[in-house]
Amino acid sequence: IPNKIHNNILIDILKENKIPTISPLGLQKNQTFNIIGDTAAGAIAKSLQSRRLLLMTNLEGVLDKKKKLIEEVSSSEVLEMIKNNIISGGMIPKINTCLDAISNGVRGVVIVDGRKPHSILFELFSDKGAGTLIRK
């Protein structure tokens, strides 16, 4: 997990009502690292004290043991799902990013299906939302 985000440039860009494009690279002792996009997004959300973080995946969101979408889940429930192998594989690093963000001030993280057209707009501008909301 990145330990420092230099967010001054991001804040300046956002103040100009522009959307920044971020290449998730990290530096340590003159060495460059490629950081997983979800991990970088979580670290940026924490550093900007964001209310919400949206992460995209190739699933509807977090699925229960019957493979049905869970619309809202708490951090403790997610940890239990990992323990019981309901959440596994590549979803675990994404969930860990969610949990880290939530435990560091982000109010909620939503995992949405990036394959569905307009899923982010649906999440932002509808009462029902899209995907899974993970909350503290």
Model regions: which residues?
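C-terminal catalytic "cap/lid" subdomain
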Residues: 1-136
